[in-house]
A protein has these predicted regions:
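C-terminal cap/substrate-recognition subdomain and adjoining C-terminal extension
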Residues: 53-160
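Alpha-helical substrate-recognition element adjacent to the catalytic core
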Residues: 1-80, 159-160
Length: 160
């Protein structure tokens, strides 16, 4: 059985915390489509921090992720997630792979003897993981674009 985190399948949304506001991850979809036939559809989704279970199930169905089971956990701490994964490992007998985007959870699950895969997309860094970049206010961006457009226009006019 493959246990894959919901964060692998969907990108976080800046608009809302609801699962329905998320967009599917192209890399997550490729990973899903690779493992699904190899493990005869024995794929489980691990949704941590999700409060709207029905909305999550509808999102998975709408996006074409046919999981054999979906496990929900309201608490989104590292310890709670690792404990639930250990419980699922005991219930299902053997988890072939656990796939997640959180390196702390992957390290602890791997330490407990479950094969893991840390999924990252190096060319896109999540804002919460980046320490060097800060979000700019929209007004600041608009001012900067306007200033660049004015400078470009002035450069083209020359002395008239």
């Amino acid at each position: 059985m493959i246990l894959i985190s919901l964060d692998v399948l969907s990108l976080p949304s800046n608009v809302s915390d609801e699962v329905g506001a998320r967009q599917p991850s192209p890399e997550g979809r490729k990973l899903w489509n690779t493992f699904f036939p190899a493990f005869n559809g024995r794929m489980a989704v691990f949704a941590s921090g999700v409060t709207n279970e029905q909305g999550c199930l509808e999102w998975l169905k709408r996006e074409g992720f046919k999981a054999s089971t979906v496990d929900f956990i309201a608490e989104n701490t590292v310890e709670a997630r690792v404990e639930r994964i250990q419980n699922l490992h005991a219930v299902y007998g053997r988890i072939n792979w656990y796939i997640d985007t959180d390196p702390r959870v992957v390290a602890k699950v791997s330490h407990n003897g479950i094969p893991t895969l840390l999924m990252t997309v190096p060319h896109i860094v999540r804002p919460e993981w980046s320490e060097s970049r800060t979000k700019k206010a929209w007004d600041t961006i608009v001012e900067e674009v306007d200033a660049q457009a004015l400078a470009r226009a002035e450069r083209n006019w020359g002395d008239v």
